[in-house]
C-alpha cells in the first residue's frame, strides 16, 4: 500500500517547480534540496506524476541530474524545444547551459 502524500508537501514541491524560468530546467534532486529534502528526489518525481490534479505547473522543466527526460512524458521534449532548450546528440538536455541557477 502506498503512502498518501500531504497536500502541503505537494504544493511546496509544485511551488518550486512553478519558479523554474522558461528556457531552463531543474533536476529532481535540485527541487528536493530546495525544499530541505535533499535525499528525496524520487518523492519529487512522484509528486510531478500527479501534478495535473493540483493545477497547471511547468513539470516539463524537471529532468534527471544528467538531463534525461521523463520516460512517460512524450510531450516534454517538444515543450522544452518550444522554450528554446536545446538537446545534445544523446537526447539529453545540456545541463551546463540550461540548468536553472536557483542559488542552492
Place the predicted regions along the sequence by residue.
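Nucleic acid-binding interface residues in structured DNA/RNA-binding domains
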Residues: 2-104
Amino acid at each position: 500500500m502506498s503512502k498518501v502524500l500531504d497536500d502541503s508537501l505537494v504544493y511546496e514541491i509544485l511551488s518550486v517547480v512553478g519558479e523554474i524560468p522558461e528556457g531552463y530546467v531543474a533536476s529532481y534532486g535540485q527541487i528536493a534540496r530546495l525544499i530541505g529534502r535533499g535525499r528525496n528526489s524520487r518523492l519529487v518525481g512522484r509528486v510531478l506524476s500527479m501534478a495535473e490534479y493540483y493545477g497547471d505547473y511547468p513539470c516539463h522543466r524537471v529532468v534527471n541530474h544528467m538531463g534525461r527526460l521523463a520516460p512517460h512524458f512524450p510531450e516534454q521534449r517538444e515543450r522544452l524545444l518550444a522554450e528554446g532548450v536545446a538537446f545534445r546528440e544523446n537526447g539529453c538536455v545540456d545541463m551546463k547551459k540550461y540548468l536553472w541557477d536557483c542559488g542552492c
